[in-house]
Amino acid sequence: MVAIPDSSQDLLSIDEAISELATIRDFLRWSVSLFNEHQLVLGHGFDDPWDEAVALVLHALHLPWDTDVRIQDARVLPAERKVICSLLARRVLERVPTAYLTGVGWFAGIPFQVDQRVLIPRSPIGELIEKQFAPWIDPAAVESILDLCTGSGCIGIACAQYFPDALVDCADLSEDALDVAERNVLDLGFEQQVNVIYSDLFEALDGRTYDIIVSNPPYVDKQDMDALADEFHHEPRMGLEAGNDGLDIVRKMLPELSRHLNP
């Protein structure tokens, strides 16, 4: 686990450094250096510290992520510096992932609302969804999809985006997670296509069957869970840990799959 630096000393150094910065470009460059210096763990929606710095700084300035790069030479106001300082302190000193600080996690090209009730979207399933599971699936033949352990709803909603003629059920055992999923369904305009269900895997599905079943279930074993970097410990443990070998949920799921999958 990454050692947390002394908060009082480092917060002071962050505050002092920011007082010397003038433009958005200055803040981006310095944020990347800060992330590298403190060896922040990436992997919660960002592949490199530059992209993460852009997301954090632009969020603090109430600017969209795709703002024209020419604005990077604009000066940052004193009040804005304080907001950036506060966010950087939480990211560096507390190791809070950026997606939780901005409230947005991207998946399959879609922005999802996220908070610490759900995992931050990052499953490689997203690439398969964007390709409509080619070459294994005929997209035109897909009428129903189930997303088990849906969390934020990102996988199920992404399926709805890329299979517009399919009805999608998103199931989870966490009521907190389902609240977030429901909000994403409504905010993204999928309420006519996506249904959010409280269910322990298949238990509340009343024998329904589907053309596609997708899932990113908890898969981390107990030993690895305890050794994960601090960033991961801001996420709900229920969404990550799956027993001594990481397969508790998978073992429970597999015997039921064939009964709910259309031929």
Regions found by a protein language model. Name each.
Residues H38-G43, F133-A140, G189:
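Alpha-helix termini
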Residues V2-A108:
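N-terminal auxiliary segments of SAM/dcSAM-dependent transferases
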Residues F27-W30, E52, V83-I84, P124, ...:
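Charged catalytic carboxylate motif
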Residues I71-Q72, V76, K82-P164, A171-R183:
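SAM-dependent Rossmann-like transferase core, predominantly class I methyltransferases
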Residues H62-L63, V118-L119, Y219:
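Active-site/binding-pocket entry motifs
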Residues L128, Y162-P263:
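S-adenosylmethionine
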